[in-house]
């Protein structure tokens, strides 16, 4: 990854980038929302398209000279529609949060009632957290998971929908390891006359590969990020029925954004093109296979998993059985070369800054080439580190085993 000009002009920024590259190369990345994009995606994002302003949409811009970026955005839109079977796609959102905001602005008024998943049960900030714009602007009613099974309680969702008559029901999560029944959600939404939106940010790559039910046939609106399991650049996207296309486009521009980031949209187009290839299906299947194997291996090591396992790319470890908090576990694992994030678990007695769990995902390690045997080894390393966090000899052993794995699967060389 040559950066000869940058190294000469701004050695401080260059060094920070090199340090981050080394971190990614020498550590095992298990944060469920992160992934490693292809070099083609990075080339598109680092292209001259970063210079071009293009307010508006293809064929309807407020600036001249947009004929080439129009081609790029149209490619991204058409590939998104093809990949997910959608009638309309908007690829301009800068993030998943802004994609969600645009949907809310399209159909909601200040104070309207919305049903969304409790953040501590696996939801997302933009699904009604009181510290987020969503919880401030709208009256969010929370649904959650069953205290025994840790799976979405659809009877509870229905009861709350019937009681509160929401204008919108939101499905999707940032830390839910099980398959979501979109058909059931739509049935509930129809029963109370609500719109139905799905935030598939975490599972978009699995949906694209046919490994998770596609929400597009059921939802009025589907939002997603373009990174995570989709393995594209950091950004957002909205899919919707044609009847809402003009409203959604207007909500993004001029509603909440100005000029789109054309270099990022180019990278989105490349990633969506990659996801349309047959080998992406193999990749996504390997993500799920690795997650299931890692879950089994962790259970064999004596760990407790929220809901007992996983159907997708992520799993949650309940650390209470070994007497650790998520905050401590995250720090211990980081020191031996494994990157995770502390995460609340359902009915967590700890604060969000401490937590009783950690969230683990397999998208990034799968991109790197890790397979089932490596999942077994990762489980063993995690077990050694967390059960012997004060034993420097054991921690050194864990570091050596991490190094052996990362050296076996080089990244960006």
From Swiss-Prot:
- Specify which residues bind (6S)-5,6,7,8-tetrahydrofolate according to the UniProt entry for this protein: 119, 123-125, 351-353
Q: What UniProt keywords are attached to this protein's entry?
A: Amino-acid biosynthesis, Cytoplasm, One-carbon metabolism, Pyridoxal phosphate, Transferase
**What InterPro entries does this protein's entry cite?**
PyrdxlP-dep_Trfase (IPR015424), PyrdxlP-dep_Trfase_major (IPR015421), PyrdxlP-dep_Trfase_small (IPR015422), Ser_HO-MeTrfase (IPR001085), Ser_HO-MeTrfase-like (IPR049943), Ser_HO-MeTrfase_PLP_BS (IPR019798), SHMT-like_dom (IPR039429)
Q: Which reaction does it catalyse?
A: (6R)-5,10-methylene-5,6,7,8-tetrahydrofolate + glycine + H2O = (6S)-5,6,7,8-tetrahydrofolate + L-serine
User: Where is it located?
Assistant: Cytoplasm
Cofactor dependence: pyridoxal 5'-phosphate
**Site feature (Plays an important role in substrate specificity) residues:** 227
| Cellular component GO terms held in the UniProt record | cytosol
Select a single GO molecular function from the record's annotations and give it. glycine hydroxymethyltransferase activity
**Which residues get modified to N6-(pyridoxal phosphate)lysine?**
228
Tell me the pathway. One-carbon metabolism; tetrahydrofolate interconversion; Amino-acid biosynthesis; glycine biosynthesis; glycine from L-serine: step 1/1
EC assignment: 2.1.2.1
What the record says about family reads:
Belongs to the SHMT family.
Q: How does it assemble?
A: Homodimer.
Q: What does this protein do?
A: Catalyzes the reversible interconversion of serine and glycine with tetrahydrofolate (THF) serving as the one-carbon carrier. This reaction serves as the major source of one-carbon groups required for the biosynthesis of purines, thymidylate, methionine, and other important biomolecules. Also exhibits THF-independent aldolase activity toward beta-hydroxyamino acids, producing glycine and aldehydes, via a retro-aldol mechanism.
Q: Which PANTHER family match?
A: SERINE HYDROXYMETHYLTRANSFERASE (PTHR11680), SERINE HYDROXYMETHYLTRANSFERASE 1 (PTHR11680:SF35)
Its name, as the record gives it, is Serine hydroxymethyltransferase
**Organism, per UniProt?**
Anoxybacillus flavithermus (strain DSM 21510 / WK1)
Q: Which gene encodes it?
A: glyA
